[in-house]
């Protein structure tokens, strides 16, 4: 899946939830049935607008971030080309 608008919806959702990247990473473990979650660095790639920013991510990672933020996945990511 691809992040929307270079990650702005993700950054907004993190801010609205009052979370840090570290706390969001912890929350992804809470919502992961396997208990693994995703790393702080992976979330950093999702939200970065600089050289470390990435546009494409595994579906599982996107799902965990959306669930941890209590947002529909479609608000944060899409399955098509980057927007």
Specify the residue positions occupied by each region the protein language model found.
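A short, Lys/Arg-rich alpha-helix, primarily the initiator
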Residues: 1-27, 31, 63, 74
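Recognition helix of helix-turn-helix/homeodomain-like DNA-binding domains
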Residues: 30-55
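DNA major-groove recognition helix of helix-turn-helix
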Residues: 47-51, 61, 77-80
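DNA major-groove recognition helix of helix-turn-helix/homeodomain DNA-binding modules
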Residues: 57-75
């Amino acid at each position: 899946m691809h992040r929307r608008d270079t990650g702005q919806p993700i950054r907004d959702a993190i801010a609205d939830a009052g979370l840090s990247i570290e706390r969001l990473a912890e929350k992804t473990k809470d919502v992961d049935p396997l208990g693994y979650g995703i790393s702080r660095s992976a979330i950093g790639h999702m939200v970065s607008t600089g050289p470390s920013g990435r546009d494409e991510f595994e579906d599982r990672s996107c799902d965990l971030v959306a669930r941890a933020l209590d947002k529909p996945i479609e608000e944060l990511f899409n399955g098509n080309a980057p927007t």
